[in-house]
A protein has these predicted regions:
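The structured alpha-helical core of multi-pass membrane proteins
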Residues: 1-628
Length: 628
């Protein structure tokens, strides 16, 4: 037993490492297709010279080292919430570390929520620029195919999104190996060109980056807007930490991804110095002519895999936002019986698809799309730094002498990248910012609206003890079976119970008041799932606890109630739900237009029946009209 355990550990680490290469690093792994080309595009005015090429290469190399390796691989992955990472995990840590109602809590939550909203803008641009840049390789192989680049890109995008409902379980096992081959090809192409001009390796010296700024001044600073393309996808390293673990991600980055990326970028630099005409598409010109079409095919596969990771990440982020109370319920379908994280959300899927197609048609080329790329990414990077600094100093009590220098270094880098991308706002960068602002408004409106709704319901609530005393003194007619009343409040009598009693004049033999409560941790163990309190004979309050990455399942939770002495038979249990009809009204607590938006969101939210996996034939819905 002891002899085989290490082998099992090694094999599982290897499998997770290969998986991480496919999912975590797909986005950053496809950046070499367009990054060097953009750095020397006309918009930055850089001429191809030895100093400029070495300067750009040095900036890219040290961006990979400082931002990806030092900040995310080493630092950010320490700021985890019980092993989980990402903006929502950071937000939940902020909730835990701040006092309810404080101004500090409000500002940090608003900042984190805006960072999460920016992810959606990034999630729209990534599939568009990735797939389009790959298919553009056809122009190099066969110029006659140039008119078909946009249509072929749209076909690939449509197929990608249409396959989402079937899930990625069948082909997911190929993601890691295919991306591993991709990184091997990146390294090989880079090496083949480096050996023809090894002088480019001098760019490892950061003094070339410093000299680049000194020589090019403001134009050199603006070129950071292209350099940042080399580190897009870094948020995925932090977000997917819970899926693969810290060690596999760090091993994959250190042994495979970083060396392959560095070699490829240096190889492109060597090619440009040897043949400046290759600047129109240095990535594809690195390959021999006979390998162009296979390379286009492999690049398309790699960009589809990178896009899949972003799409799955968008689903996951949305589900977490729902759990944390920032988003209305949406339909969620599971596409795998074994992997709980593999989900499909139709509304998100088709919205993303339309946005991606619109971007492909509207911008027309990956070069034009690159002008819109970077603003959202650098915004998220900056917000990550601020929230992580707050968490490690407040929650984990890191000493200021260690935390402050790190904050200064990371913020200086993040703000520099963000500032260099601000000029892109007029050239398409407004799009992800607009998406972020709209979604931030919707998230904040939903959160505020739910709080306002609970406030409106509170004055009409009846205390549980007076209610029990009333039905004890004047017992209503009791009918066989169990009634479960879902309620968001953990105090008072649910409106659905009062409506049922007023209209039907009966009460079931057993009554359960059930509240589903979402916690600021990723997962809650089954042993801690339920709180059961007996309020009176055959009258109980049950609180079911779920983490923000858990899947609420009321029937399964009630099965656990047996451990607390409560037996449930689904065929003898009725579930009573309240459905509110919201009426916007001019008030001081929320503007009328936001109340109208909240009412629309509530009206279009998916049914609690399906979301909580309650059998539809056991549900009774009772309506309530509420003025906001």
């Amino acid at each position: 037993m002891s002899a085989t355990a290490p082998e099992t550990t090694k094999s599982s680490t290897l499998a997770l490492t290969v998986g991480a290469i496919g999912v975590v690093f797909g986005d950053i792994g496809t950046s070499p297709i367009y990054t060097m080309r953009e750095a020397f595009s006309d918009r930055y005015g850089l001429v191809v010279s030895l100093d400029n090429v070495l300067g750009v290469l040095s900036l890219i190399f040290w961006a990979l080292m400082l931002v990806v390796t030092l900040k995310y691989i080493i630092f950010m992955m320490r700021a985890d919430n019980r092993g989980e990472g990402g903006m929502m995990a950071l937000l939940s840590l902020v909730l835990r570390a701040t006092r309810r109602g404080s101004r500090q809590r409000y500002l940090l939550l608003s900042l984190g929520l805006f960072g999460a909203a920016l992810f959606y803008g990034d999630g729209m641009i990534t599939p568009a620029i990735s797939v389009l840049s790959a298919v553009e390789g056809l122009e190099i192989a066969t110029p006659a195919l140039q008119p078909f680049v946009i249509p072929l890109t749209i076909v690939v995008v449509v197929l990608l999104f249409m396959l989402q409902r079937r899930g990625t379980a069948a082909v997911g096992a190929l993601f890691g190996p295919v991306t591993l081959v991709w990184f091997a090809v990146l390294a090989l192409l880079g090496l083949l060109n480096i050996v023809q001009n090894a002088a480019v390796l001098a760019a490892i010296n950061p003094l070339y980056a410093v000299a680049f700024f000194a020589d090019n001044k403001f134009a050199g600073f603006l070129a950071l807007g292209a350099v940042v393309l080399a580190i897009t996808g870094t948020e995925g390293i932090y977000t997917d930490m819970g899926h693969f673990g810290k060690k596999p991600i760090r091993v994959a980055w250190s042994l495979v991804v970083l060396p392959s990326l560095a070699l490829n970028y240096f190889g492109q630099g060597a090619l440009i110095l040897r043949d400046p005409q290759a600047l129109s598409h240095p990535f594809y010109y690195m390959a021999p002519e006979w390998a162009l079409l296979p390379l286009v095919g492999l690049a398309t596969a790699a960009t589809v895999i990178a896009s899949q990771a972003v799409i799955s990440g968008t689903y996951s982020l949305t589900r977490q936002a729902i759990q944390l109370g920032y988003c209305p319920r949406l339909d969620i379908f599971h596409t795998s019986e074994s992997e709980i994280g593999q989900i499909y959300m139709p509304w998100i899927n088709w919205t993303l698809m339309l946005a991606v197609i619109g971007l492909v048609i509207g911008f027309g080329s990956s070069s034009n799309l690159a002008s819109a790329y970077g603003v959202a990414v650098t915004g998220m990077m900056t917000i990550d730094t601020i929230l992580a600094f707050f968490v490690i100093t407040t929650l984990w009590k890191w000493t200021k002498w260690l935390a402050v220098p790190l904050l200064i270094i990371f913020l200086f880098i993040d703000v520099s990248f963000f500032s260099a991308n601000v000029h892109k706002l007029l050239h398409g960068g407004w799009f992800p910012i607009l998406i972020g602002v709209v979604l931030f408004t919707l998230f904040a409106t939903w959160r505020r609206g739910r709080g306002l709704l609970m406030k409106r319901l509170a004055p009409g609530a009846i205390g549980i003890q007076p209610f029990i005393e009333s039905i004890t003194q004047h017992p209503p007619t009791r009918v066989p079976g169990t009634a479960v009343f879902l309620t968001a409040a953990t105090e008072g009598v649910p409106h659905a119970l009062l409506h049922n009693l007023n209209h039907n004049k009966v009460l079931h033999e057993r009554v359960v008041l059930l509240t589903v409560q979402n916690e600021d941790i990723p997962h809650v163990d089954d042993s801690e799932r339920l709180e059961v309190e007996q309020l009176a004979p055959d009258f109980h309050r049950v609180i079911a606890h779920y983490g923000f990455k858990d899947e609420p399942d009321v029937p399964s939770a009630l099965e656990l109630a047996r451990q607390h002495g409560l037996e449930f038979s689904m065929m003898e249990t009725s579930f009573f739900l309240s459905r509110q009809t919201l009426v916007p009204k001019m008030g001081r607590e929320m503007s009328l237009w936001r109340e109208k938006v909240f009412a629309i969101m509530a009206r279009n939210a998916s049914s609690a029946t399906g979301y909580f996996k309650i059998p539809a034939n056991r549900v009774v819905e009772l309506g309530t009209r509420i003025e906001l």
